[in-house]
Amino acid sequence: MFIAVVGLSHRTAPVEIRERLSIPEAEVGERIQQLRAHPHIEEAAILSTCNRLEVYIVTPEMESGVRQTMQFLAEAKGIPLPQLRPHLFTLLYQDAVTHLMRVAAGLDSLVLGEGQILSQVKKAQQLGQACNGMDRILNRLFKAAITAGKRIRTETGIGTGAMSISSAAVELALQEQGSLSQGKVTVVGAGKMARLLVQHLLAKGAVDITVVNRSLERAEALAKQFEQPIQVLPWESLLSSIAESNLVFTSTGATQPILTYEQLAGVLQPDQPLLLVDISVPRNIDPGVEKLRGVQVFNVDHLSRIVEENRAQRQKLALAAEALVEEEVEQFMEWWRSLETVPTISSLRHKVESIREQEMEKALSRLGKDFAEKHLEVIEALTRGIVNKILHDPMVQLRAQRDIEARRRAMQILQELFNLDPMPFQAQQER
């Protein structure tokens, strides 16, 4: 058997192609069944996100399995294969294993180290299991990838640190104020960036959030996107809301400053502490506001530096993460290579068990009908225990042998000594 992955991602395909090939969660089970219907695909799993579509397969015939998977992708979305092929990538053997582990760790993501992909890999495993698309090999692979993703995040911390302006704004506010659960937060604006601000604020513990926008309807629509209560105020209440806040974010499309020194000086108490974070371009807050005592102002340039510092830090952490990926890949490959021993071990166990059963029948026939049932159970347990004890060490040593040639010599010796005829099993090679 062989492992392969065929797919596309933000690295290989534009968004127009990714959109067309995206497979909704509700369709995944049906699509996996379509894949499994192909004669050379034994197992299948689909990982579909906004930035990637990847099909993982286990196949006895590598060339045929990959070809059938490519054809499936083309036919599923009605894209001619010659048009689709330039955007596809194919990884085989250990490269496919390494790829999934890097994906789960966020090392192949558009935002290096992002955490959402790990939950998406978990969901792909759940969907594959639910429709019986995954068996022993892909189940083990996805479990190993999820373990790798968790370990890398825990040991390297690669997922920490803001990587967007909105998250950096909230991270900065948290650093400056220590906690967001105390006091009032005002968000000025109701567009995409404002929504992200509210999302990050809630995630970091803010509980008293007010959204102010020129269009009250848009502000109300934003508030409805969250389960937590978000207060909404009309534009006329902007200054009064700011006067009651200790933290303000501005994110509007205004081409001129909406907050000036004169406006804030007229509503703030002397030396009133206030943190203003302006994520707009052009700036929403006039530079003169910084002259107010007790007021701190941060803009996009401050936030961009934070994002760049975090990005550079993640690049350093990625080196350590890659080393951990190699360790996890090698553990999986050891298990994968050990599957080559399964037919020999199974054949040996079957032969020894047959001998045990035959000898049990002979012994019982000599003991006669008066032999007690409880004695039979004891002898059954005794003989099975002897068989298991005898076979245990050879089986463990055979599976643990890392040298491929040495393991194959050991299997051949066992087959010759015990006259075994194991079923053919095509083991995965490292390359």
From Swiss-Prot:
Q: What's one Pfam family here?
A: Shikimate_DH
Quote the pathway field.
Porphyrin-containing compound metabolism; protoporphyrin-IX biosynthesis; 5-aminolevulinate from L-glutamyl-tRNA(Glu): step 1/2; Porphyrin-containing compound metabolism; chlorophyll biosynthesis
Residues given in the record as substrate binding sites: T49, C50, N51, R52, S109, E114, G115, Q116, Q120
Q: Where along the sequence does the record put site: Important for activity?
A: H99
Q: Which InterPro entries does this chain map to?
A: 4pyrrol_synth_GluRdtase (IPR000343), 4pyrrol_synth_GluRdtase_dimer (IPR015896), 4pyrrol_synth_GluRdtase_N (IPR015895), GluRdtase_CS (IPR018214), GluRdtase_dimer_dom_sf (IPR036453), GluRdtase_N_sf (IPR036343), NAD(P)-bd_dom_sf (IPR036291), Shikm_DH/Glu-tRNA_Rdtase (IPR006151)
* Keywords in alphabetical order: Chlorophyll biosynthesis, NADP, Oxidoreductase, Porphyrin biosynthesis
List the Gene Ontology MF annotations in alphabetical order.
glutamyl-tRNA reductase activity; NADP binding
Q: Which PROSITE patterns match?
A: GLUTR
Report the record's Gene Ontology biological process terms: chlorophyll biosynthetic process; protoporphyrinogen IX biosynthetic process
The EC number(s) given in the record are 1.2.1.70
Q: Where is the active site?
A: C50
| Claim: Oxidoreductase is one of the keywords in the record | yes
Which of this chain's residues are annotated to bind NADP(+)?
A: G189, A190, G191, K192, M193, A194
Q: What's the catalysed reaction?
A: (S)-4-amino-5-oxopentanoate + tRNA(Glu) + NADP(+) = L-glutamyl-tRNA(Glu) + NADPH + H(+)
User: What is its biological role?
Assistant: Catalyzes the NADPH-dependent reduction of glutamyl-tRNA(Glu) to glutamate 1-semialdehyde (GSA).
**Record's domain comment?**
Possesses an unusual extended V-shaped dimeric structure with each monomer consisting of three distinct domains arranged along a curved 'spinal' alpha-helix. The N-terminal catalytic domain specifically recognizes the glutamate moiety of the substrate. The second domain is the NADPH-binding domain, and the third C-terminal domain is responsible for dimerization.
Self-association state and partner proteins as the record states: Homodimer.
What else does UniProt say about it? During catalysis, the active site Cys acts as a nucleophile attacking the alpha-carbonyl group of tRNA-bound glutamate with the formation of a thioester intermediate between enzyme and glutamate, and the concomitant release of tRNA(Glu). The thioester intermediate is finally reduced by direct hydride transfer from NADPH, to form the product GSA.
The record's comment on protein family reads: Belongs to the glutamyl-tRNA reductase family.
The name of this protein is Glutamyl-tRNA reductase
Tell me the gene name: hemA
